[in-house]
Amino acid sequence: MSRRSTAEKETAKSDPIYRNRLVNMLVNRILRHGKKSLAYRILYRAMKNIQQKTEKNPLSVLRQAIRGVTPNVTVKARRVGGSTYQVPVEIRSTQGKALAIRWLLGASRKRPPGRNMAFKLSYELMDAARGNGNAIRKKEETHRMAEANRAFAHFR
């Protein structure tokens, strides 16, 4: 067993324009091949698009979208006696936010081709804030799975 003490968890940094940690988390998930300036450009264009379309504060739309997509429970595969069970597990808020961001970006990448990523992301965020879209569908599907496998909750 290690004699070292557990490392302090670093607080997430905030982005330069909105000064928000959530925006920075989103940028770090958009990031591909180390091109952070491109990731920032994509997100800020998406935010500008949201501002123009909804005439609301884009940060509040982003928060609402992430709050709507964040799951409370998820299922984990657990092997017991030769068979695998999908065991429902409650998740912490930070883990839930990370999942929500991942689902939002996945849903926006899967949107029909033709427009750029900023456009797709802005529309996915607006849909999620309204309560529909593929990311919301993914959350509901996860909750349904957890509800269906509630009988296996004691395997935790």
UniProtKB/Swiss-Prot annotation:
Gene Ontology CC annotation, any one: small ribosomal subunit
Q: Keyword Cytoplasm, does the record have it?
A: no
InterPro entries, sorted: Ribosomal_uS7, Ribosomal_uS7_bac/org-type, Ribosomal_uS7_CS, Ribosomal_uS7_dom, Ribosomal_uS7_dom_sf
Output one GO BP term: translation
UniProt-listed PROSITE patterns: RIBOSOMAL_S7
Keywords of the record, alphabetical order, are: Chloroplast, Plastid, Ribonucleoprotein, Ribosomal protein, RNA-binding, rRNA-binding
Where does the record place it? Plastid, Chloroplast
Example GO molecular function: structural constituent of ribosome
Q: Which family does it belong to?
A: Belongs to the universal ribosomal protein uS7 family.
UniProt subunit comment: Part of the 30S ribosomal subunit.
Free-text function comment from the UniProt entry: One of the primary rRNA binding proteins, it binds directly to 16S rRNA where it nucleates assembly of the head domain of the 30S subunit.
What protein name is recorded for this chain? Small ribosomal subunit protein uS7cz/uS7cy
Q: Which gene encodes it?
A: rps7-A
